[in-house]
Amino acid sequence: MKVLFAVNNENISTLIVKKYQKEYKEIISYKNVYYFNAILKELQKDKSYDRIVISEDLEKFTNSNYQQMDKFIFDRLDSISDEASNLQGENIPIILICSERRAKGEEILVKLFGIGVYDAVIGKDRDISEVCNLLNRPRSKKEAKEY
């Protein structure tokens, strides 16, 4: 499996890969990028990724206005989801590790569901095991709606 990681700490992606490979006995090849625009560029260049893991706090915000931050995140993920398709034209699942402040049912999560981001990890699920589970088997639309 090939994974594009966009998390603000390389140790996180390394821990996820090690745990996944140990648990599922499958090798992961991966690349780390550190900006939202770098995700777009990488997806335009390489359509062979099987999964994308993005941390909501990938980039630091100078503004503490949550509405503006949510708009920025949504706009970036909207662009990324448009590019996130493989050579067969199928959507590449995006696993979003949400910030600590997120709660189920928030407007931004509903909007992300609308653009096909079904694998948001929030609250107590924000751990490496849950990310590994979603790497192995991303949520269906129905499962995401229930989550």
Task: Describe the predicted segments one by one.
Residues 1-146:
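Long, basic/Gly/Ser/Thr-rich N-terminal segments
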